[in-house]
């Protein structure tokens, strides 16, 4: 559901 690089949001 989230963008591919959304995990980089820190």
From Swiss-Prot:
Primary residence: secreted
Alphabetic keyword roster: Amidation, Neuropeptide, Secreted
Entry keyword Secreted: yes
Highest rank taxon of the organism: Eukaryota
Modified residues (Phenylalanine amide): 10
GO biological process, one term: neuropeptide signaling pathway
Subcellular location(s) per record: Secreted
Family of this protein: Belongs to the FARP (FMRFamide related peptide) family.
Designated name of the protein: FMRFamide-12
Species assigned in the record: Sarcophaga bullata (Grey flesh fly)
């Amino acid at each position: 559901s989230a963008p591919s690089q959304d995990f980089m949001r820190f």
